[in-house]
A protein has these predicted regions:
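N-terminal glycine-rich FAD/FM-binding segment characteristic of electron-transfer flavoproteins
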Residues: 1-305
Length: 305
């Protein structure tokens, strides 16, 4: 199970004891068994759902929600998931909130906290009507404790002829490499303008990330310079992340970058400029040259080697 799915289940469990996990795709035995450790499972297992076609998955989610009289639909805040449940919200006529990072129940009313205006503020909102559709930041909630006895797994019938066909699946290029996705990782190591080329970025940012089992991220400056791919960009025009630990290496702290990571639980920064804006947001800061400090950190983490 991906960490983001665990976060969605964790949020749902905090809100209600009566939850069900809907699993979609093909050949789902392994993920069904994993999901059943946390909640009863409805398994939508069909070849027509094997490909990541959002309108088909949204159709199934909406049909199941109607059949189950669901009051709340929860998913993780990935680009893919928001595309799917956003469509489902439209089909169901429900209200939706994305990127939720916290909540509270007040007199039976669910109040949600989410960043707005590029992360400048955290707003508390209340959704009206039913069902309510919510996506939560992957690192905002922990997966609940697994049950001693697995919950039941119930297959659901899929009418392939009733699925939308407006979008046809062609191909999928899967990401290669052992590092986790930057939007779901519990630790993110990001590099900024201080790194002069892609080799230096990989040696320092990638090296520290590998020592920590972390994902790598990048500032917009490195993407614009062609040093890192767009898929690594963290910020207002890139990925929005909120890991348990965010390490900013040679990143000054431009507003557009802060918008993408300021809700991280712990922020640590290394920058040779003591007046860099990133230090105003960092929980821990080290004034120094990343070319000197990062190799020392990597060596310590690797047992002094």
């Amino acid at each position: 199970m991906r960490p983001g799915s665990g976060a969605a289940i964790g949020f749902a469990r905090e809100v209600s004891e009566d939850i069900t996990a809907l699993v979609l795709g093909e050949n789902l035995d392994a993920i069904n068994a994993e999901s059943a450790k946390f909640a009863p499972v409805l398994a939508a297992d069909h070849p027509a759902l094997a490909a990541p076609v959002a309108d088909r998955w949204a159709h199934v989610i909406a049909e199941v929600a109607r059949a189950q009289n669901a009051e709340l639909i929860v998913a993780t805040s990935t680009t893919w998931a928001k595309d799917i449940v956003g469509r489902a919200a439209g089909l169901l006529g429900g209200a939706m909130a994305s990127d939720v990072i916290g909540h509270e129940m007040v007199d039976g009313e669910l109040r949600l906290r989410r960043p707005m205006f590029a992360g400048a503020v955290n707003a508390t909102i209340v959704l009206e009507g039913s069902p309510q559709i919510i996506t939560v930041r992957p690192s905002a909630y922990d997966a609940p404790e697994s049950a001693d006895t697995p919950f039941a797994i119930e297959p659901i019938a899929i009418d392939a002829d009733a699925l939308p066909n407006a979008t046809q699946f062609e191909s999928l290029d899967r990401k290669t490499g052992a590092r986790p996705d930057v939007t779901e990782a519990r630790i993110v190591v990001s590099g900024g303008r201080a790194f002069k080329n892609s080799e230096d970025f990989e040696q320092h940012v990638g090296g520290l990330a590998d020592a920590l089992g972390a994902a790598t991220g990048s500032s917009r400056a490195l993407v614009d310079a062609g040093i890192t791919p767009n898929s690594l960009q963290v910020g207002q025009t890139g990925k929005i992340v909120a890991p348990e630990l965010y390490l900013a290496l040679g990143i000054s702290g431009a507003v557009q970058h802060l918008a993408g990571m300021k809700n991280s639980r712990v922020i640590a920064a290394i920058n040779q400029d003591p007046d860099a804006p990133i230090f105003e947001f960092a929980d821990y800061g080290l004034v120094g040259d990343v070319y000197e400090e990062v190799p020392r950190l990597i060596a310590e983490l690797n047992g002094g080697q």
